[in-house]
Regions:
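Conserved NAD(P)H cofactor-binding loop of Rossmann-fold oxidoreductase domains
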Residues: 80-85, 233-234
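Catalytic loop of short-chain dehydrogenase/reductase
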Residues: 124-156, 161-170
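C-terminal substrate-recognition "lid" of short-chain dehydrogenase/reductases
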Residues: 207-231, 236
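Short, small/polar-rich loop/turn modules that mediate ligand/substrate recognition or access, typified
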Residues: 169, 174, 225-226
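A short, exposed helix-loop element centered on a Lys and neighboring polar residues
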Residues: 112-113, 162
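Conserved glycine-rich cofactor-binding loop
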Residues: 14-15
Length: 239
């Protein structure tokens, strides 16, 4: 495969938003390295599926290495994998803490560090793009959804998005974040949909396509970096 074809790494890619992103990046002409803890092989020669726990410090470097080995480069990274545990703060356990920080922070760190290093080896002034997935709960906390660990970890991603955007702006790597509201995915039981829809001023849950389109917009928006793009049906604006 030509080393001039752009290459994206997408985590949490086996279902939901991640699976939608794999299809979207292929439509943009990218080869894709798709990771999830459990993921089946793809019949598409432009998609390399790699099973692995993103919380394992060895998984991120392995994904970047395989992207370069199979496709020759890395141009985009979508840190889609994430864990959300809603509990009262005093009920969180050490296991909860390790799980959430392992995926949301440790997984982000080791993969993004290696991915940016690979992007910097690309020629030209537009070398790469990182997109993180956050949550609108950081900006609009709700008594109905106690989420201190999400705020701790995803809030950190919002902050590091701005930090990395400035650090690498002059070197051709952009860094942005999408902060979704509640999205209609298999993780939400159908009987909860009405209640979840009521938490958004627009009166509905988000769809997978809403997030995929936001991310592909950022992928092509060359003047956007350091952006926290809320795709939350108005949640972050208020009620």
């Amino acid at each position: 495969m030509s080393s001039e074809q752009k290459v994206a790494i997408i985590t949490g890619a086996s279902q939901g938003i991640g699976a939608g992103l794999v299809q979207a990046y292929r439509k943009l002409g990218y080869a894709v390295v798709a990771n999830s803890r459990h993921i089946t092989p793809s019949s598409d020669p432009g998609v390399l599926t790699v099973p692995g726990d993103i919380a394992d410090p060895e998984t991120g470097p392995r994904l970047v290495g395989l992207a370069v080995e199979h496709f020759g480069r890395v141009d985009a990274l979508v840190n889609n994998a994430g864990v959300f545990v809603a509990k009262p703060f005093t009920d969180y356990t050490s296991a909860d803490f390790d799980l959430v920080t392992g995926v949301n922070l440790r997984g982000f760190f080791y993969l993004t560090q290696r991915a940016i290093a690979a992007m910097l080896r690309n020629e030209g002034t537009r070398r790469g793009h990182v997109v993180n997935i956050s949550t609108s709960l950081i900006d609009h906390a709700s008594t109905a959804v106690p989420s201190a660990l999400a705020s701790l970890t995803k809030g950190g991603l919002n902050a590091v998005t701005r930090s990395l955007a400035i650090e690498y702006a002059a070197r051709g790597v952009r860094v942005n974040t999408v902060a979704p509201g509640i999205i209609r995915t298999p993780m939400h039981a159908v009987e909860t949909h009405d209640a979840l829809a009521s938490m958004h001023p627009v009166g509905r849950m988000g769809d997978i396509a809403d997030i995929v389109e936001a991310i592909t917009y950022l992928e092509t928006a060359e003047f956007d970096t350091g952006e926290i793009l809320h795709v939350d049906g108005g949640q972050s604006a208020g009620h």
